């Protein structure tokens, strides 16, 4: 009887299956990355502000941990790891829990509900309307910027980076609608209501000259009573490969401004400023522990303000005490590299 040759001897054994250690290792690495992303998004305070201030850096760009989720999911699909794909649900849930409500309220990640002049203020609407803008010392059209801001109809308008050469243009453009104004150094305030008690606020970090004046306080005599208005421009921060998140001068200035606010005797306080920091940055705790950020209370979207061409952070702030934010939004771009921000505040 003729047999069938199978090509295999009796002693031969099936070839062992190839180990999947590498695939599993890659899958586990993605799981770890997903868990870390979720933890850092939910608890940025876990990262200390050691050399380079990594904690503040994470808090500054915290919303931008969101794009890590689709990247992790794509890598999980490429690795064909079901466990890694499922793990991406954790950072997705954390991110949506933190930032989803702001997006669902309306507005996108960048515009924060760019409004027009519906909140025009003269006290008759039952709310105080304020506008804050770093007008830029390189603004090619100061007068046009001033007119655009006035169209929003704020009761008070705060400006930073006011250079002596551009100041007359701002004064002329705003004179008709804002009979009261005060300027200290490179910051100023224009108001529909009388101002009194204007003076500088010393927020100068150590090592800077006496000509560095970027803080002021005045009292606006509004229909709701006196309101202490602070205008400030904190020092810039830098991100470098060697120094990391260089924010020491900004942090020192924020602490000084916080002490000034803590000593304020009036019940109603408004801070308008380019703080070069987001409200969630731990370095601004001297301010956020005493004042309520208007955008967090009544804004839509992320309300990003800088840089104006493609905003990635909200460093221009309205913060209050003794007043209730009812709306907060960004205004259309001007000749500045910052977007203006506005808020309506109920007494």
Give residue spans per PLM region.
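Soluble catalytic domains of enzymes that build or remodel membrane lipids, polysaccharides, and related
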Residues: 126, 136-150, 158-347
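N-terminal, active-site-proximal structural segment of metallo-dependent hydrolase catalytic domains
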Residues: 2-171
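A charged, solvent-exposed segment within the mature domains of Sec-exported extracytoplasmic proteins
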Residues: 1-3, 14-19, 240-251
